[in-house]
Amino acid sequence: LITSSAASDVYKRQVFNPEVMSLADLLKVFWECHDPTQGMRQGNDIGSQYRSVIFLNSELHKDESLSSLETYQDELELNGYGPITTEISMMKNYFLAEEYHQQYLAKNPNGYCGLGGTGCSFPNN
């Protein structure tokens, strides 16, 4: 879990090994595990810190990320959802969150998590 330096926003940092999992597979999981059409919220959690965002650490991932957004947008529209509000931009400075926020749901199995997908599967091409 990380926080941005520009504000007190909290994000999930996902490090991946493309030899184990492709960026395409990671993006599929990303789109399916939350509702990217909710703007500044996820479930009952409201505010900019709950917005859907992809921070990239390499320009090499930008085109594939944008393409996946367009693909999933088409699927969402077919199922009655509005536009995706996910921001895709380069990662700037970040700082690790406080220890009590690290692995929060593992430490608090009954803790609240406002994430919920749309039920729309990412199309297989």
PLM-predicted stretches and their roles:
Residues 5-125:
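Flexible coil/turn and secondary-structure edge motifs
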Residues 1-2:
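Generic short N-terminal amphipathic or hydrophobic helices
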